[in-house]
Amino acid sequence: MDLHGGNIYRLQREGKDNLLDYSSNINPLGVPEKFKERVINSFHILEKYPDPEYVELRENIAKYNGVKLENIVVGNGATEILFLHMKAMKPKKTLIVAPAFAEYKRALDTIESEILYYPLLEENSWNLDVENFLKELPQCDLVVICNPNNPTGSFIPLEKIERINSELEKRGIKLFIDEAFIEFVEDWENQTAILLKSKNIFIMRALTKFFAVPGVRLGYGITFDSEVLKKMESYKEPWSVNSFAELAGKTMLWDSEYIETTEKWITEEKKWFFEESQKIENIRTYKTNVNFVLVKLLKYNSSYVREKMIEKDVVVRDASNFQYLNESYIRLAIKNRENNIKVLKALEEVMRWKHLC
């Protein structure tokens, strides 16, 4: 199975064209028009190396998040930030709240960190029971939380993050928070862990999902601990962020029209998508805070449903390789209304079939 989902390129090489890719959680509005215009008029920037310190880029990211230049580290996608942070901090024992992004484990494996997992439970609608979590928390060096969570779409409000961090600080445990999807959360500006301004917290972000530019590869980290930043920079390769990625960060963060349109779309569409999916037989869906939905299959298994959906020109995410999930789960992106209708219709037809798994 592919680690991150549908591998649309492999399917296309096999002759499957015109697929709706619902395995990838990218903003359906596509690349912002203002960024496209800037790219067309900016080919001259390729004639020079990027600023090795990325001062203007970091200033823009800092202003967007209400922090200072010295709080920002940039990288070639959030993945570079993740691997840099683990390499710099070298936690001997790490607790991951799961299910979660597979790259956490890969990054920790490179430094031979002992990995423990704490499960989000279906009976809690995948929401973290904070008091129980703190009660059962083992001694470790680092806790990793994906917030909003991928693949469940659950979200831990800021006051609960503050409660968790306060307890972790007392125990000498650092907190790593992946906020790659937070801009899809309603009122996210008042829910981000940045507001805590805690030296104990490292926050990872990316432009990939919200601004629909996975091919650009621009991620960043936010820390209020200057020593963490220095350690990460010492391991960082020069010019890992290319000139167009730098341009993206300096352009898209200020595209208020695109941001407002996206926020309006996700507020309406996630509600509609959840309500419509509830009408489909033999599945269970969970309320989401973001642009994807976790689906439990009450009939058939994930690999079977994935193949049948491909026959209907739709790629879904087989979620069975997430920690604590199994072949009863798939994940669906939320896209534009026209395509969402097609996908839910296809899923309804698949779940009605009488074939045996």
Can you say where each PLM-predicted feature lies in the sequence?
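N-terminal "arm"/small-domain region of PLP-dependent enzymes with the aminotransferase-like
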Residues: M1-K48, Q139
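PLP-dependent aminotransferase class I/II
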Residues: G30-P32, E53, N200-K279, I283-Y286
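Short loop-beta-helix segment that forms the pyridoxal 5′-phosphate
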Residues: P50, A62-L84
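Short acidic capping loops at alpha-helix termini that bridge into adjacent secondary structure
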Residues: K68-I72, G172, E179, K199-N200
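PLP-dependent aminotransferase-like
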Residues: K87-I145
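Active-site phosphate-binding strand-loop segment of PLP-dependent enzymes
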Residues: E123-E183
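PLP-dependent enzyme catalytic core of the Aspartate aminotransferase-like
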Residues: E159, E311-K312, Q323-C357
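Conserved PLP-binding catalytic core of the aspartate aminotransferase-like
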Residues: T267, I280-K312, I334
